């Protein structure tokens, strides 16, 4: 059993500030919290050490990179093959996140797509795996901000 890390209002203020902008200056957070810069630095280091904060990141808007839509896939597979299918789906170039889940579907995945037409093709590719029983797809319609590590920048020219 893992023990929960205790956090207080100052820790929450640090987290909220960094969620809004990962580049927020610790001095500004300290001023807002009415504590010293050293307090904020130590608390952030503690949150990193204990795993509360695993890092800071940038949010990307896929539409600014020429992607028309973001879609989620819910996939039902036979139980002993979940990890195999998670790996299979995760290797597809458009998939930026895949994980096992609990519920009607065993796997959840997120894809960024150049166009809506690609949705059906990707769904068919997933459905083509012999252990996949069902695939449901949904297109996200609201503002989309992602921070996946494996976001593809295929159109960027290499130097």
Walk through the language-model features, giving the residues of each.
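A compositional/biophysical signature of low hydrophobicity enriched in polar/charged and small residues
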Residues: 1-159
């Amino acid at each position: 059993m893992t023990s929960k890390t205790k956090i207080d209002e100052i820790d929450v203020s640090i987290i909220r500030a960094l969620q809004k902008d990962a580049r927020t200056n610790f001095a500004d957070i300290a001023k807002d919290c009415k504590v010293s810069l050293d307090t904020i630095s130590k608390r952030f280091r503690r949150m990193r050490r204990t795993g509360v904060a695993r890092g800071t990141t940038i949010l990307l808007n896929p539409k600014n990179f020429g992607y028309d839509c973001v879609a989620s896939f819910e996939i039902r597979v036979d139980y002993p093959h979940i990890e195999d299918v998670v790996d299979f789906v995760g290797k597809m170039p458009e998939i930026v996140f895949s994980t096992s889940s609990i519920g009607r579907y065993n796997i959840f995945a997120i894809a960024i797509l150049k166009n809506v037409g690609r949705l059906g093709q990707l769904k068919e590719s997933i459905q083509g795996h012999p252990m996949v029983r069902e695939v449901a797809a949904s297109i996200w319609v609201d503002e989309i901000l992602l921070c996946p590590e494996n976001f593809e920048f295929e159109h960027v020219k290499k130097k």
